[in-house]
């Protein structure tokens, strides 16, 4: 997720390739940052949707692990799902990417959207959920703990 001039990108690309596997020049200076914000929106909304679905399954009496296994290979499957569903099912909210950091990124996305006159209703909703969890002392937990927001709303716990 790089922004800048092609000639500069070409010079530093070998160094960047040692730090990551997907090195893409997305546009001029600032484009890399906007791409990072877009990524964080997608991750946050995916985690919230996964949480909502697993709580719905659990509350409906369906085994959430079986739901995950059934849908992970289809269109709803994703890298986010494969990374976060097992954590959710194991009740493992040890930080990989903390809620407090995702709050920062989503706040930056909100600010960027305001600068171009756009609303981000799904981002706003997930950000509110994360802020509530942070207020409850879960800010240092992995963002998979968004599951806890839904669990609290429905007074139910998702687990294997």
Question: Which role does the model predict for each range below?
Answer:
Residues 1-35, 43-78:
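Internal alpha-helical scaffold of NAD(P)-dependent oxidoreductase catalytic cores
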Residues 17, 158-160:
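ATP-dependent carboxylate/acyl-activation modules
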Residues 29, 33, 77-79, 83-144, ...:
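Interdomain hinge/lid region at the active-site interface
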Residues 68, 149-150:
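Sequence-level detector for tyrosine residue identity
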